[in-house]
Amino acid sequence: MSTKDKLNLPPKRTINTRLSTPVHIPPPINSESTRITPQHGSPPRFGDHRISAAQGLFQRRRNARKIDHPLGWFLKNRHAAAHIPQRTTKTSQKLVLLPENHAVNSFNEEESNYEDLLTPSDAYNLIKLENLPRDKREELGFPRATAYCVCEAFQLPKVKHFLKHYHKVRAKKYDEVLYAVYHLPLVYGRSESCRVSSGPAPDDMPSSASNHNQKHLDSDKPDNENFDSHIISQLYRISEIFVFSYGVVVFWNFSLSQEKDILADLTFGGDNSLMVKPLAEEECEIEDLHFHYAPNTKRPRIYNDMIHIPSADNKMKLAMSHALAQSVKLSRFELRTDVTMNSALFYPKKLALYGHLGLSRVEVVRMSGHLFQLRVDVNLISNILDTPDFLWDSEPLLLPLYTAFREYLEIGPRTNVLNRRCKVIFDMLDIFGKSSADRKMNSITWIIIILISLFVIIFTLEVILRLRWAHR
Protein backbone atom coordinates (compact mmCIF):
# COMPACT_ATOMS: atom_id res chain seq x y z
CA MET A 1 0.00 0.00 0.00
CA SER A 2 1.39 3.37 -0.93
CA THR A 3 1.88 6.30 1.42
CA LYS A 4 -0.86 8.18 -0.36
CA ASP A 5 -3.36 5.39 0.39
CA LYS A 6 -2.32 5.37 4.02
CA LEU A 7 -3.11 9.10 4.32
CA ASN A 8 -6.52 8.56 2.68
CA LEU A 9 -5.93 11.48 0.34
CA PRO A 10 -8.70 11.99 -2.24
CA PRO A 11 -7.78 12.62 -5.88
CA LYS A 12 -6.12 15.93 -6.59
CA ARG A 13 -8.74 18.45 -7.57
CA THR A 14 -9.97 21.86 -6.58
CA ILE A 15 -11.80 22.15 -3.27
CA ASN A 16 -14.72 24.39 -4.13
CA THR A 17 -15.80 25.65 -0.72
CA ARG A 18 -16.68 29.15 -1.86
CA LEU A 19 -19.70 29.80 -4.04
CA SER A 20 -19.24 32.48 -6.65
CA THR A 21 -22.87 33.61 -6.37
CA PRO A 22 -25.08 33.95 -3.30
CA VAL A 23 -27.82 31.44 -2.74
CA HIS A 24 -31.16 31.71 -0.99
CA ILE A 25 -31.92 29.34 1.89
CA PRO A 26 -35.65 28.64 2.26
CA PRO A 27 -36.99 27.87 5.74
CA PRO A 28 -36.39 24.16 6.46
CA ILE A 29 -39.52 22.01 6.69
CA ASN A 30 -37.77 18.70 7.31
CA SER A 31 -34.48 17.04 6.53
CA GLU A 32 -35.79 15.50 3.30
CA SER A 33 -37.60 18.47 1.84
CA THR A 34 -34.94 21.12 2.46
CA ARG A 35 -33.53 22.42 -0.81
CA ILE A 36 -31.00 25.10 -1.75
CA THR A 37 -32.04 27.29 -4.66
CA PRO A 38 -29.27 29.35 -6.28
CA GLN A 39 -30.14 32.94 -6.99
CA HIS A 40 -28.05 35.74 -8.37
CA GLY A 41 -27.86 38.86 -6.31
CA SER A 42 -25.66 41.48 -4.74
CA PRO A 43 -22.96 40.66 -2.17
CA PRO A 44 -23.90 40.67 1.50
CA ARG A 45 -25.12 43.95 2.93
CA PHE A 46 -27.26 44.23 5.99
CA GLY A 47 -30.23 46.31 5.09
CA ASP A 48 -33.79 45.84 3.89
CA HIS A 49 -34.04 42.44 2.15
CA ARG A 50 -30.33 41.63 1.89
CA ILE A 51 -30.22 39.23 4.83
CA SER A 52 -31.00 36.24 2.61
CA ALA A 53 -28.16 37.18 0.26
CA ALA A 54 -25.74 37.27 3.19
CA GLN A 55 -26.91 33.88 4.36
CA GLY A 56 -26.54 32.58 0.84
CA LEU A 57 -22.98 33.83 0.48
CA PHE A 58 -21.97 32.01 3.65
CA GLN A 59 -23.76 28.81 2.57
CA ARG A 60 -20.63 27.42 0.88
CA ARG A 61 -19.38 25.74 4.06
CA ARG A 62 -22.50 23.64 4.48
CA ASN A 63 -21.52 21.70 1.38
CA ALA A 64 -17.79 21.65 2.14
CA ARG A 65 -16.43 18.14 2.01
CA LYS A 66 -15.17 16.67 5.27
CA ILE A 67 -11.80 15.05 4.72
CA ASP A 68 -10.41 12.32 6.95
CA HIS A 69 -6.90 12.98 8.16
CA PRO A 70 -4.72 12.53 11.26
CA LEU A 71 -6.34 15.52 13.03
CA GLY A 72 -9.90 14.28 12.62
CA TRP A 73 -10.41 14.49 16.38
CA PHE A 74 -10.75 18.27 16.04
CA LEU A 75 -14.09 17.64 14.32
CA LYS A 76 -15.27 14.26 15.57
CA ASN A 77 -14.39 14.69 19.25
CA ARG A 78 -14.09 18.41 19.57
CA HIS A 79 -15.65 18.73 23.00
CA ALA A 80 -13.25 16.14 24.37
CA ALA A 81 -10.21 17.72 22.74
CA ALA A 82 -11.01 21.41 23.16
CA HIS A 83 -11.67 23.17 26.43
CA ILE A 84 -13.79 26.29 26.44
CA PRO A 85 -11.89 29.29 27.82
CA GLN A 86 -13.09 30.37 31.24
CA ARG A 87 -14.66 33.68 30.23
CA THR A 88 -18.18 34.89 30.90
CA THR A 89 -18.61 36.53 27.47
CA LYS A 90 -19.31 33.06 26.06
CA THR A 91 -22.78 33.36 27.58
CA SER A 92 -23.23 36.91 28.89
CA GLN A 93 -23.48 38.51 25.40
CA LYS A 94 -21.31 41.48 26.28
CA LEU A 95 -20.96 44.27 23.73
CA VAL A 96 -17.56 45.88 23.18
CA LEU A 97 -16.92 48.59 20.61
CA LEU A 98 -13.58 48.13 18.90
CA PRO A 99 -11.96 51.56 18.49
CA GLU A 100 -9.91 52.57 15.50
CA ASN A 101 -7.88 55.68 16.37
CA HIS A 102 -9.41 56.78 19.65
CA ALA A 103 -9.85 55.64 23.21
CA VAL A 104 -11.45 52.39 24.25
CA ASN A 105 -15.11 52.43 25.16
CA SER A 106 -17.00 49.33 26.24
CA PHE A 107 -20.72 49.13 26.81
CA ASN A 108 -23.18 46.62 28.09
CA GLU A 109 -26.12 45.65 25.93
CA GLU A 110 -28.49 47.90 27.88
CA GLU A 111 -26.17 50.91 27.52
CA SER A 112 -25.62 50.60 23.77
CA ASN A 113 -27.54 52.59 21.22
CA TYR A 114 -27.65 50.64 18.00
CA GLU A 115 -28.80 53.68 16.04
CA ASP A 116 -25.48 55.31 16.87
CA LEU A 117 -23.62 52.38 15.34
CA LEU A 118 -25.58 51.70 12.16
CA THR A 119 -28.12 53.32 9.95
CA PRO A 120 -31.66 52.70 11.24
CA SER A 121 -32.53 50.45 8.31
CA ASP A 122 -29.64 48.11 9.09
CA ALA A 123 -29.87 48.04 12.90
CA TYR A 124 -32.62 45.43 13.15
CA ASN A 125 -30.92 42.99 10.80
CA LEU A 126 -27.61 43.36 12.65
CA ILE A 127 -29.24 42.62 16.01
CA LYS A 128 -30.94 39.59 14.48
CA LEU A 129 -27.66 38.22 13.16
CA GLU A 130 -25.78 38.87 16.40
CA ASN A 131 -28.37 37.01 18.45
CA LEU A 132 -28.11 33.87 16.33
CA PRO A 133 -26.80 30.87 18.30
CA ARG A 134 -23.28 29.73 17.56
CA ASP A 135 -24.48 26.50 15.96
CA LYS A 136 -26.83 28.40 13.67
CA ARG A 137 -24.04 30.75 12.56
CA GLU A 138 -21.86 27.73 11.90
CA GLU A 139 -24.64 26.10 9.90
CA LEU A 140 -25.10 29.24 7.80
CA GLY A 141 -21.37 29.27 7.14
CA PHE A 142 -20.37 32.61 8.63
CA PRO A 143 -16.61 33.23 8.34
CA ARG A 144 -14.66 31.90 11.31
CA ALA A 145 -11.93 33.50 13.41
CA THR A 146 -10.33 30.59 15.26
CA ALA A 147 -7.26 30.20 17.46
CA TYR A 148 -5.62 26.83 18.19
CA CYS A 149 -2.97 26.13 20.82
CA VAL A 150 -1.32 22.97 19.49
CA CYS A 151 2.27 23.02 20.80
CA GLU A 152 4.64 24.76 23.17
CA ALA A 153 6.41 26.71 20.40
CA PHE A 154 6.78 27.03 16.62
CA GLN A 155 10.05 27.24 14.73
CA LEU A 156 9.07 30.30 12.69
CA PRO A 157 11.94 30.14 10.13
CA LYS A 158 11.06 26.53 9.31
CA VAL A 159 7.34 27.32 9.21
CA LYS A 160 8.00 30.20 6.81
CA HIS A 161 10.03 27.93 4.53
CA PHE A 162 7.34 25.24 4.67
CA LEU A 163 4.51 27.64 3.79
CA LYS A 164 6.47 29.08 0.90
CA HIS A 165 7.49 25.80 -0.74
CA TYR A 166 4.47 23.61 0.03
CA HIS A 167 1.48 25.90 0.53
CA LYS A 168 2.68 28.37 -2.10
CA VAL A 169 2.12 31.43 0.08
CA ARG A 170 4.48 34.21 1.08
CA ALA A 171 4.74 34.67 4.83
CA LYS A 172 5.64 37.99 6.39
CA LYS A 173 7.09 38.18 9.89
CA TYR A 174 5.93 40.69 12.50
CA ASP A 175 8.30 40.14 15.44
CA GLU A 176 7.01 36.85 16.89
CA VAL A 177 4.23 36.31 14.33
CA LEU A 178 4.11 34.93 10.79
CA TYR A 179 1.36 36.29 8.54
CA ALA A 180 0.29 34.61 5.29
CA VAL A 181 -2.59 35.07 2.83
CA TYR A 182 -4.38 32.15 1.14
CA HIS A 183 -6.54 32.52 -1.97
CA LEU A 184 -9.75 30.52 -2.05
CA PRO A 185 -10.70 27.96 -3.10
CA LEU A 186 -7.79 25.92 -1.78
CA VAL A 187 -6.35 23.11 -3.90
CA TYR A 188 -4.93 19.77 -2.87
CA GLY A 189 -1.23 19.70 -2.12
CA ARG A 190 1.25 19.17 -4.92
CA SER A 191 3.12 16.49 -2.97
CA GLU A 192 2.49 13.95 -0.25
CA SER A 193 4.11 16.27 2.30
CA CYS A 194 1.11 18.60 2.39
CA ARG A 195 -2.63 18.21 2.12
CA VAL A 196 -3.67 21.61 0.77
CA SER A 197 -2.11 24.71 -0.72
CA SER A 198 -3.27 28.18 -1.65
CA GLY A 199 -5.29 28.57 -4.80
CA PRO A 200 -4.14 30.87 -7.60
CA ALA A 201 -4.83 34.57 -7.19
CA PRO A 202 -7.72 35.57 -9.50
CA ASP A 203 -6.93 37.96 -12.32
CA ASP A 204 -9.70 40.33 -11.30
CA MET A 205 -8.43 40.65 -7.73
CA PRO A 206 -7.53 44.32 -7.13
CA SER A 207 -4.05 44.90 -5.81
CA SER A 208 -5.32 47.27 -3.14
CA ALA A 209 -8.70 45.86 -2.21
CA SER A 210 -8.21 46.61 1.45
CA ASN A 211 -7.06 50.16 0.77
CA HIS A 212 -9.95 50.77 -1.60
CA ASN A 213 -12.42 49.46 0.93
CA GLN A 214 -10.91 51.50 3.74
CA LYS A 215 -10.86 54.66 1.64
CA HIS A 216 -14.55 54.34 0.99
CA LEU A 217 -15.32 53.61 4.62
CA ASP A 218 -13.33 56.62 5.80
CA SER A 219 -15.67 58.95 3.95
CA ASP A 220 -18.19 60.85 6.03
CA LYS A 221 -21.23 59.57 4.13
CA PRO A 222 -20.57 56.31 2.37
CA ASP A 223 -22.88 55.72 -0.57
CA ASN A 224 -24.27 52.22 -0.09
CA GLU A 225 -25.66 51.99 -3.60
CA ASN A 226 -22.42 53.02 -5.29
CA PHE A 227 -20.21 50.89 -3.08
CA ASP A 228 -18.00 48.57 -5.10
CA SER A 229 -19.75 45.27 -4.40
CA HIS A 230 -17.11 43.42 -6.38
CA ILE A 231 -14.43 44.44 -3.86
CA ILE A 232 -16.53 43.17 -0.93
CA SER A 233 -17.23 39.85 -2.62
CA GLN A 234 -13.49 39.41 -3.23
CA LEU A 235 -12.74 39.87 0.48
CA TYR A 236 -14.51 36.60 1.26
CA ARG A 237 -12.23 34.81 -1.21
CA ILE A 238 -9.16 35.64 0.87
CA SER A 239 -8.19 33.75 4.02
CA GLU A 240 -5.42 34.69 6.41
CA ILE A 241 -3.32 32.81 8.94
CA PHE A 242 -1.21 34.05 11.86
CA VAL A 243 1.37 31.66 13.35
CA PHE A 244 2.68 32.73 16.77
CA SER A 245 6.03 31.62 18.11
CA TYR A 246 4.51 30.39 21.40
CA GLY A 247 2.53 27.59 19.74
CA VAL A 248 -0.72 29.25 18.61
CA VAL A 249 -2.24 29.43 15.12
CA VAL A 250 -5.04 31.92 14.32
CA PHE A 251 -7.19 31.39 11.22
CA TRP A 252 -9.38 33.99 9.51
CA ASN A 253 -12.05 32.96 6.97
CA PHE A 254 -11.17 29.26 6.83
CA SER A 255 -13.69 26.46 7.09
CA LEU A 256 -13.26 23.88 9.83
CA SER A 257 -12.02 21.21 7.42
CA GLN A 258 -9.48 23.61 5.92
CA GLU A 259 -8.21 24.54 9.38
CA LYS A 260 -7.71 20.87 10.18
CA ASP A 261 -5.85 20.27 6.93
CA ILE A 262 -3.43 23.13 7.55
CA LEU A 263 -2.89 22.03 11.16
CA ALA A 264 -2.19 18.51 9.92
CA ASP A 265 0.42 19.90 7.52
CA LEU A 266 2.06 21.91 10.29
CA THR A 267 2.02 18.88 12.60
CA PHE A 268 3.30 16.19 10.25
CA GLY A 269 5.02 18.24 7.54
CA GLY A 270 8.60 19.42 7.36
CA ASP A 271 10.05 16.23 8.89
CA ASN A 272 7.98 16.88 12.03
CA SER A 273 10.34 19.68 13.04
CA LEU A 274 8.02 22.68 12.78
CA MET A 275 6.65 22.29 16.31
CA VAL A 276 8.38 22.11 19.67
CA LYS A 277 6.68 19.71 22.11
CA PRO A 278 3.37 19.13 20.28
CA LEU A 279 0.45 18.82 22.68
CA ALA A 280 -1.65 15.73 23.10
CA GLU A 281 -5.19 15.75 21.75
CA GLU A 282 -6.82 16.33 25.12
CA GLU A 283 -4.46 19.23 25.88
CA CYS A 284 -5.17 21.29 22.74
CA GLU A 285 -7.18 24.47 23.22
CA ILE A 286 -9.55 26.23 20.81
CA GLU A 287 -11.01 29.74 20.83
CA ASP A 288 -13.50 30.21 18.00
CA LEU A 289 -15.56 33.23 16.98
CA HIS A 290 -17.29 34.46 13.83
CA PHE A 291 -16.75 37.69 11.94
CA HIS A 292 -18.33 39.70 9.17
CA TYR A 293 -17.23 42.49 6.85
CA ALA A 294 -19.77 45.23 7.54
CA PRO A 295 -18.95 48.30 5.40
CA ASN A 296 -21.96 50.20 6.78
CA THR A 297 -20.77 49.83 10.37
CA LYS A 298 -19.53 53.17 11.65
CA ARG A 299 -17.36 51.48 14.28
CA PRO A 300 -16.06 47.91 14.53
CA ARG A 301 -17.61 45.91 17.34
CA ILE A 302 -17.85 42.46 18.89
CA TYR A 303 -20.99 41.05 20.47
CA ASN A 304 -21.97 37.48 21.30
CA ASP A 305 -18.70 36.20 19.76
CA MET A 306 -19.58 37.93 16.47
CA ILE A 307 -17.04 40.46 15.16
CA HIS A 308 -18.11 43.24 12.79
CA ILE A 309 -15.24 44.96 11.01
CA PRO A 310 -15.59 47.53 8.21
CA SER A 311 -12.59 46.40 6.16
CA ALA A 312 -10.07 43.62 5.61
CA ASP A 313 -7.12 45.52 7.05
CA ASN A 314 -4.50 42.93 8.00
CA LYS A 315 -3.05 45.15 10.75
CA MET A 316 -6.45 45.28 12.43
CA LYS A 317 -6.68 41.49 12.27
CA LEU A 318 -3.13 41.23 13.60
CA ALA A 319 -4.06 43.20 16.71
CA MET A 320 -7.16 41.06 17.30
CA SER A 321 -5.19 37.87 16.60
CA HIS A 322 -2.70 38.80 19.33
CA ALA A 323 -5.55 38.95 21.83
CA LEU A 324 -7.07 35.69 20.54
CA ALA A 325 -3.72 33.91 20.75
CA GLN A 326 -3.11 35.15 24.30
CA SER A 327 -6.60 34.04 25.32
CA VAL A 328 -6.19 30.48 24.03
CA LYS A 329 -2.69 30.23 25.55
CA LEU A 330 -4.07 31.45 28.87
CA SER A 331 -6.82 28.85 28.59
CA ARG A 332 -4.21 26.09 28.40
CA PHE A 333 -2.61 27.24 31.66
CA GLU A 334 -6.04 27.55 33.27
CA LEU A 335 -6.65 23.91 32.42
CA ARG A 336 -3.25 22.83 33.74
CA THR A 337 -3.84 24.77 36.94
CA ASP A 338 -7.24 23.13 37.45
CA VAL A 339 -5.87 19.64 36.85
CA THR A 340 -2.90 20.16 39.16
CA MET A 341 -4.93 21.72 41.95
CA ASN A 342 -7.66 19.08 41.74
CA SER A 343 -5.04 16.36 42.06
CA ALA A 344 -3.56 18.04 45.15
CA LEU A 345 -6.75 19.12 46.95
CA PHE A 346 -6.99 15.83 48.84
CA TYR A 347 -3.74 16.33 50.71
CA PRO A 348 -4.59 19.59 52.56
CA LYS A 349 -7.82 17.94 53.74
CA LYS A 350 -5.91 14.87 54.88
CA LEU A 351 -3.39 17.09 56.63
CA ALA A 352 -6.21 18.89 58.44
CA LEU A 353 -7.90 15.64 59.53
CA TYR A 354 -4.93 13.46 60.47
CA GLY A 355 -2.09 15.92 60.96
CA HIS A 356 0.16 14.31 58.37
CA LEU A 357 0.17 13.74 54.62
CA GLY A 358 0.77 10.02 54.72
CA LEU A 359 3.23 10.28 51.83
CA SER A 360 6.79 9.18 51.55
CA ARG A 361 9.52 11.75 51.16
CA VAL A 362 9.88 10.88 47.46
CA GLU A 363 6.15 11.34 46.86
CA VAL A 364 6.16 14.69 48.65
CA VAL A 365 9.12 15.87 46.59
CA ARG A 366 7.40 14.70 43.39
CA MET A 367 4.19 16.56 44.26
CA SER A 368 6.16 19.68 45.14
CA GLY A 369 7.99 19.39 41.83
CA HIS A 370 4.71 19.35 39.86
CA LEU A 371 3.45 22.42 41.69
CA PHE A 372 6.74 24.24 41.29
CA GLN A 373 6.81 23.46 37.54
CA LEU A 374 3.35 24.97 37.18
CA ARG A 375 4.53 28.01 39.12
CA VAL A 376 7.44 28.45 36.71
CA ASP A 377 5.16 28.08 33.67
CA VAL A 378 2.76 30.70 35.01
CA ASN A 379 5.65 33.10 35.49
CA LEU A 380 6.73 32.45 31.90
CA ILE A 381 3.24 33.08 30.51
CA SER A 382 3.26 36.53 32.12
CA ASN A 383 5.67 37.57 29.37
CA ILE A 384 3.34 36.17 26.70
CA LEU A 385 0.36 38.08 28.10
CA ASP A 386 2.15 41.42 27.95
CA THR A 387 1.32 43.92 25.21
CA PRO A 388 3.28 42.91 22.08
CA ASP A 389 6.30 45.06 21.31
CA PHE A 390 5.09 45.37 17.72
CA LEU A 391 2.09 47.42 18.87
CA TRP A 392 4.26 49.66 21.04
CA ASP A 393 6.95 50.30 18.45
CA SER A 394 5.34 50.06 15.00
CA GLU A 395 1.56 50.35 15.33
CA PRO A 396 0.66 52.37 18.46
CA LEU A 397 -2.70 53.33 16.89
CA LEU A 398 -3.78 49.69 17.15
CA LEU A 399 -3.28 49.60 20.93
CA PRO A 400 -6.88 50.71 21.72
CA LEU A 401 -8.23 48.00 19.41
CA TYR A 402 -6.01 45.37 21.02
CA THR A 403 -6.99 46.57 24.50
CA ALA A 404 -10.71 46.46 23.69
CA PHE A 405 -10.43 42.93 22.30
CA ARG A 406 -8.52 41.84 25.42
CA GLU A 407 -11.30 43.34 27.48
CA TYR A 408 -13.93 41.29 25.65
CA LEU A 409 -11.90 38.09 26.08
CA GLU A 410 -11.47 38.97 29.78
CA ILE A 411 -7.75 38.29 29.71
CA GLY A 412 -7.09 40.67 32.62
CA PRO A 413 -9.62 39.16 35.07
CA ARG A 414 -8.68 35.62 34.05
CA THR A 415 -5.01 36.42 34.63
CA ASN A 416 -5.84 37.76 38.09
CA VAL A 417 -7.73 34.56 38.92
CA LEU A 418 -4.77 32.52 37.69
CA ASN A 419 -2.41 34.57 39.86
CA ARG A 420 -4.61 34.01 42.91
CA ARG A 421 -4.57 30.29 42.23
CA CYS A 422 -0.81 30.48 42.01
CA LYS A 423 -0.75 32.01 45.47
CA VAL A 424 -2.73 29.01 46.69
CA ILE A 425 -0.16 26.79 44.99
CA PHE A 426 2.63 28.67 46.79
CA ASP A 427 0.86 28.06 50.11
CA MET A 428 0.49 24.37 49.27
CA LEU A 429 4.20 24.22 48.42
CA ASP A 430 4.98 25.82 51.76
CA ILE A 431 2.73 23.35 53.60
CA PHE A 432 4.25 20.37 51.81
CA GLY A 433 7.73 21.69 52.49
CA LYS A 434 7.02 22.21 56.18
CA SER A 435 5.38 18.79 56.43
CA SER A 436 8.38 17.15 54.81
CA ALA A 437 10.75 19.15 57.03
CA ASP A 438 8.77 18.28 60.16
CA ARG A 439 8.80 14.61 59.25
CA LYS A 440 12.53 14.74 58.62
CA MET A 441 13.07 16.63 61.87
CA ASN A 442 11.01 14.06 63.73
CA SER A 443 13.19 11.31 62.30
CA ILE A 444 16.33 13.15 63.35
CA THR A 445 14.86 13.75 66.80
CA TRP A 446 14.10 10.06 67.28
CA ILE A 447 17.60 9.14 66.13
CA ILE A 448 19.07 11.53 68.69
CA ILE A 449 16.81 10.14 71.42
CA ILE A 450 17.81 6.59 70.57
CA LEU A 451 21.51 7.50 70.56
CA ILE A 452 21.20 9.25 73.91
CA SER A 453 19.34 6.26 75.31
CA LEU A 454 22.06 3.92 74.08
CA PHE A 455 24.70 6.21 75.60
CA VAL A 456 22.87 6.21 78.95
CA ILE A 457 22.52 2.43 78.89
CA ILE A 458 26.15 1.92 78.00
CA PHE A 459 27.27 4.43 80.65
CA THR A 460 25.08 2.72 83.26
CA LEU A 461 26.48 -0.69 82.38
CA GLU A 462 29.99 0.72 82.55
CA VAL A 463 29.34 2.16 86.03
CA ILE A 464 27.89 -1.12 87.25
CA LEU A 465 30.85 -3.08 85.92
CA ARG A 466 33.32 -0.69 87.55
CA LEU A 467 31.53 -0.93 90.91
CA ARG A 468 31.62 -4.72 90.79
CA TRP A 469 35.28 -4.65 89.83
CA ALA A 470 36.05 -2.30 92.75
CA HIS A 471 34.33 -4.59 95.29
CA ARG A 472 36.51 -7.46 94.19
UniProtKB/Swiss-Prot annotation:
Coiled coil: none annotated. It is a single-pass membrane protein. It comes from the Eukaryota. Pfam families: DUF155 (PF02582). Residues 1-443 are lumenal. It is found in: Nucleus membrane. Keywords: Membrane, Nucleus, Phosphoprotein, Transmembrane, Transmembrane helix. Residues 1-47, 197-223 are annotated as: Disordered. The chain crosses the membrane at residues 444-464. Signal peptide: none annotated. GO terms for biological process: mitochondrial gene expression. This is Sad1-interacting factor 3. The lineage of its organism: Eukaryota, Fungi, Dikarya, Ascomycota, Taphrinomycotina. The gene is sif3.
